[in-house]
Amino acid sequence: SLKVKALGIGGHVGFPEGSIHALYVLTEALKDLEFFQEEDRRLFQFLCRMNGDFYGNGAGIACEDELSGALCGALNIARYQEDGSKKYVWMQSDHRYPITGAVGAELGERLVHLAGLYGCKAVIKKDEKPYYLDPESDTVKTVMSAYRTVTGKDSRPFTMSGGTYARKLPNAVSYGMSLET
């Protein structure tokens, strides 16, 4: 029996600067230990590749664009599960990819391929495409005009990597999460 504890520094996957991923710290410590079976070590090595940095370099999915910046994210949940005689590790990945250029399906295919290299099987269950409204659209201009009238500030709209509720409504604008103080 082995008990290991790993500590990280919490953060938001959309703004990872200064964060340390506890799952990476854990798997980096375990990935080469002879204590574990080869199959387990390969899983730990895969998790290290996925979480070695928050920008997709180790996983081979790094990309960026001028509008939204670099892809950022992590494989952020891993849970051991048993279903009858079947044992597996369920994982959840949260990657915010750029508005232009990268396509979620293509990035997903790369992750599935990478998992296969380590004897793992990955299945992409969901792809929430980036949401973007042109700052020159009437919708954004109207919201910004109201904002400037109420606050008296001459702020400019910007794009961030957060997942937004606005994608659920056509032509919706999310704002207020990063108001100037």
Regions found by a protein language model. Name each.
Residues F54-A74, V123-G152:
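Amphipathic, soluble alpha/beta structural segments
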Residues S1, F15-L23, R79, G84-Y88, ...:
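Metal-dependent peptidase/peptidase-like ectodomains
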Residues K5, V123-K125, R156-F158:
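General small-molecule cofactor/ligand-binding pocket signal
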Residues G58-E64, L111, T159-S161:
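Intrinsically disordered, low-complexity boundary segments flanking structured domains
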Residues L2, D83, K87-V89, D94, ...:
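Zn-dependent metallopeptidase/amidohydrolase metal-coordination segment
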Residues I9-H12, K129, E180-T181:
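A short, flexible beta-alpha/helix-coil linker loop
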Residues S1-I99:
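Midchain, well-structured core segments that form catalytic/ion-binding scaffolds
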Residues L30-E38, L111, A115-G119, Y147, ...:
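Structural signal for hydrophobic packing residues in well-ordered secondary-structure cores
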